[in-house]
Amino acid sequence: MTDAVLRMLLATSKVMDVHLLTSSPLRDGLAAELTERYGIKTHLVELSEGNNPLRYIEYNKYVRTRIEECHPHIVHVHGSWDVKAAIVQRCARKMKLVTIVSPHRGLSPEIIDIDFWKSRLWKMLLYQIQMISRCTAVAAMNDKEREDVLGLGLKRRIEVMPAMTGQNSGELCAALTETYRKALDSSYRLFLLDDETKFLEATVRTAIADDDVKTEIPSLNGLSFRRISFLAFDEDATEIMKRGAEKAGMYLPQEIDVANLPRYKNKHAKTLRSLEEMSKTINVNHIPEEQREERRAVQMIVQAWTMGKKRMTLRNWAELYDLFRNRDFNEDIVGNELRHRRLKRFTKRLQKDLKSRFALKEGYVIFQ
């Protein structure tokens, strides 16, 4: 692989507003087709020459400056065993951008074995391992390259794009666009705006609160409903969002079938379990009828403690908000039981979060 084989795709949040930064001119017709069919505009970046380490420091500053100028969302790096390509990938990752790496057969056993002890080993330890393991996904040219990367045990998110080796620019454009969209959709939280999170939380609060409670829902103008849809799906709150928007008389764009869109598996995905349903599994037949609501309230808070706040979905928070806001139970009985279980401090933290996210009022809390 030569130093010139490096490309960066710079994508904005819009589907058809994409910028491609490449170190060498694209072949005839490809740049024009990218622009006409997919709205991808191409730009050229010059790579520094030579292997002087001081030039790498200078190049690192150049890459950061270039990325700050273009405000990309995706950086696509082509090549292996190139420290400058690794610099681009590292800078993009530190700036919280989606990164795609195309090794171009550079990680095959035949290539790795060449001068392994003299050069490949230290290059592997210094930057090549991090370049592959910490990127968003790897774009392989064929199934063999995919197996080579899998064999190294560094990455499981691997896309096979045979079109990269062909001459059909249409197939290449379609394959690249599909891969970039999948990577963007999988990493949507990197670009999530505060107003988009507030929009979802406001619709949830509107769905649960009484009609006399007025909630100001942010306008969708300037927001990405696609990202909001992904967030609602991952937080198990899609139906609550739609119910809240309907209650507020707000028109939502056409529903996105998030479940069937291609995305990478999130290893940090939250547990999609309902606190209400888990609390109902507790046998309350031996408890007097007048105390069952208190027992279920305690069990919901216990289940929230067991799950952990970081693993709770927005639906779980909505269930807790509904518990504090709308359920009719004796706060003294519930409070004494939570003290007995040593959950007073945890409950007070829940109340604080509910006040911040859903504007829960003081009159509805268990512990003042």
Model region roles, listed by residue range:
Residues 146-166, 170, 174:
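Helix-loop-beta element that forms the nucleotide-linked donor phosphate-binding surface
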Residues 180-368:
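Conserved NTP-donor binding/palm subdomain of two-metal-ion nucleotidyltransferases/polymerases, i.e.
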Residues 45-90, 94, 122-126, 130:
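An amphipathic, basic-hydrophobic alpha-helix
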Residues 74, 89-109, 137-139, 159:
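Active-site proximal beta-strand in glycosyltransferases
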Residues 26, 133-157:
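A short, active-site helix/loop in glycosyltransferases that binds the activated sugar's phosphate group
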Residues 1-32, 36-43, 170-174, 178:
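N-terminal subdomain of nucleotide-sugar transferases
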Residues 7-8, 107, 121-137:
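Membrane-proximal helix-turn-helix segments that form the acceptor-binding/catalytic region
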